[in-house]
């Protein structure tokens, strides 16, 4: 299921807060984990992983900054912690795959 979303916040390289927009002016805020990828953690004592996690977060923020109005999230169910899982598209480009292809995340 595709939904138009506004990106509210990038938490790390594979998690974003979004505002889902539904008909009749209904809007819902949710924390979404990007489906099928895993980025290094930003909250860790491992300094190398933290550095890579910060780079992944910055790259995701950069990819989303210019295209907030054209974001589509394809919902893939809920993850093991109850968060929605989704593929994020900006102007038709799959952001999940961009992060993997650039080495900021790995397939999961």
Predicted regions and their residues:
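Small beta-barrel nucleic-acid-binding modules, primarily SNase/OB-fold domains
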Residues: 1-108
